[in-house]
């Protein structure tokens, strides 16, 4: 039996080439596959089959000089690994796991000569990345993301605040104030507002600076650690000042700060790189935010390959 043929539809196919092209265009938008299917009057299976016709090909003969590593939550309890070209923002790879074995097996596909071209890798403070990066890329410099360093210190300050707050009577104004206005302690003191607000907890109009002063007056230990915490800022990016401050105070601070300081000293070379080099994970974090938007629009992905 003869089969009619036309340039509009491939042989033995029922979906026109134009429709498939339109599906491909919409697949790069932040739209669920079910919405694409409904818009073009095709089945969701057709959209999925069209998606699978595209393959993410890896060029094993190229790696950029500057890379960014990070992870994101693919689904509850499962972290995936993402690599991005720092300069072009092109995604180089998305791996379903962030284990050392998975990362090593992926990058060992690249010849050593290609891997030797990599000069800088930015990453967060996930220590398993350090070892694997040094083994795979012998000439690279590891640059810790400055935001994660600040966040690490900030979380320690928050734990100290909670520890001191829990020593107060939970019915007292001191406890309620410390719990309600905790963000003022975490905030950069130079950015506190001078505007007056009526605060029910204190039953008066106060500025943020005045509220902060009240909170610090409840505990001398809290005040001392807050003042130290405020000295750790990267606006001036002075590595010598940063580490001399740690060395001068490590023996007389709360054990929570001591643990943090020891980690920072251990990662001193990577933190110095973060302060001296113009690289960070900011661009990759923007990509991760886009991934979160896609996941939210599609209510998640069950199949990693489809993602």
What function would you assign to each model-found segment?
Residues 7-12, 140, 164-169:
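Short, polar/flexible loop-turn hinges at active-site or ligand-entry regions and domain interfaces
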Residues 10-14, 94, 98, 144:
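Alpha-helix capping and helix-loop boundary segments enriched in small/acidic/polar residues
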Residues 46-120, 125-132:
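RNase H-like nuclease fold core
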């Amino acid at each position: 039996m003869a089969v009619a043929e036309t340039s509009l539809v491939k042989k033995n196919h029922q979906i026109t080439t134009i429709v498939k092209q339109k599906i491909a265009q919409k697949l790069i938008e932040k739209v669920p596959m079910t919405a694409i299917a409904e818009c073009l009057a095709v089945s969701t299976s057709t959209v999925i089959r069209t998606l699978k016709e595209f393959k993410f090909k890896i060029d094993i003969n190229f790696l950029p000089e500057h890379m960014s590593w990070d992870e994101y939550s693919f689904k509850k309890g499962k972290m995936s690994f993402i690599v991005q070209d720092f300069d072009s923002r092109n995604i180089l790879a998305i791996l379903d796991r962030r284990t050392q074995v998975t990362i090593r097996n992926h990058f060992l596909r690249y010849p050593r000569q290609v891997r030797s071209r990599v000069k800088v890798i930015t990453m967060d403070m996930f220590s398993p990345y350090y070892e694997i990066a040094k083994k795979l890329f012998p000439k690279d410099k590891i640059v810790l993301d400055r935001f994660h360093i600040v966040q690490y210190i900030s979380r320690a300050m928050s734990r100290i605040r909670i520890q001191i707050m829990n020593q107060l009577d939970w019915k007292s104004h001191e406890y309620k104030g410390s719990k309600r206005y905790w963000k003022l302690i975490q905030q950069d003191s130079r950015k506190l507002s001078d505007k007056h607000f009526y605060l029910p907890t204190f039953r008066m109009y106060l500025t943020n600076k005045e509220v902060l002063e009240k909170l610090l007056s409840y505990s001398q230990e809290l005040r001392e650690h807050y003042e130290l915490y405020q000295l750790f800022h990267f606006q001036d990016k002075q590595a010598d000042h940063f580490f001399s401050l740690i060395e001068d105070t490590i023996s007389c601070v709360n054990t929570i700060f001591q643990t943090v300081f020891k980690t920072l000293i251990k990662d001193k070379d990577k933190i110095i790189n973060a302060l001296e080099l113009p690289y960070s994970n900011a661009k990759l974090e923007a990509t991760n935010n886009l991934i979160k938007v896609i996941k939210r629009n599609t209510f998640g992905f069950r199949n990693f390959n489809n993602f």
